[in-house]
Amino acid sequence: SNVNPADVESVTVLKDASASSVYGSRAAYGVVLVTTKSGSAGKASVSYNGTVGFSSPVNMPEMMSSVEFAGYMNEMKVNSGKNAPFTESAIERLGMFTADPYSEEYPGIGLNAAGDGWASAYNNQYADTDWFDYHFKDRSLRQSHNLSISGGTQKVRYMVSAGYVYQGGLIDHVEDDLDRYNLNARMSFNVKPWLKAAFNNSLAVTGIDRPMADQTIFYAQISDKYPTQVTALPVEGDYDLPSWNEVMYLKETGFERTSVSDAMSLSMTITPLDGWDITAEMKGRLDVQKSSFIMGFPKTTRPDGKVVVTSGGKQGYQYPGMHWKNTSFGSYTR
């Protein structure tokens, strides 16, 4: 996955016994050989190619409106022998809010019964929120750029390339993207008519920035949110939401991973007789990966201006207040 597609010259698949005979037991199910481009004798040649595009979410669920939600919720509760949670006046406010959202007259939320906090998502909280539309972008930028220079003489040939890939994520209001840098060098030497040498080096640096390590639970959390819950409050200050809400938690979390992979090879080929090549090859690879996960305690502002710390007991993807780092190294020589 670290290979720059612009540097690929050919892809060969070896299967079954043919792969095992060359690469051993680990290749019993086959081997994919990726050959990168190399330089040719002649003047230096400079090449550039780049692409810019956009990604968009597909098959996104369509949430019902808050008025529809209130009607179905009332019907469900009544059919189960319980009281309807939404009053007629609350449903009327839902409709008025939709026409003039987050206005001074319809801020979307009021006080709870005790007057010391915000109301729940029933009678005195009357938003019309499409949580999928709120949390996901309509489109996100993606781009790639590749620059290479190649050339050489009958004795020495070279090919050096650099690439950059950016893929923006689709989650809105937070950092969600990937950056990758590639640097490849491929050189070949005709030392003698019977002696050839080659050196290859492939370096890749990848950075991933996400709001969380596992985003699967995030999708489940937002699909469980009521459309009657607000995304904003009529007070200034830190977040203050009456129930679990991804808006404030996503801004307090962070997952970063930086990976560095450097693969090198040096080979020499001796041709004692025409048609008989003897090749000696040495390979080395260094992989370094550092991961960091941060999740804090979001602060919330009450209607009276007091700031409290939210424990976040319902958060499913990690414990709060944790800053976790991991660094791993690996290398081999063959």
Range-by-range predicted roles:
Residues V3-A6, Y23-A28, D176-D177, A213-Q215:
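Short, glycine-/polar-rich solvent-exposed loops and beta-turns at beta-strand/coil boundaries
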Residues L33-T35, S47, N146-S150, R186, ...:
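Outer-membrane beta-barrel architecture
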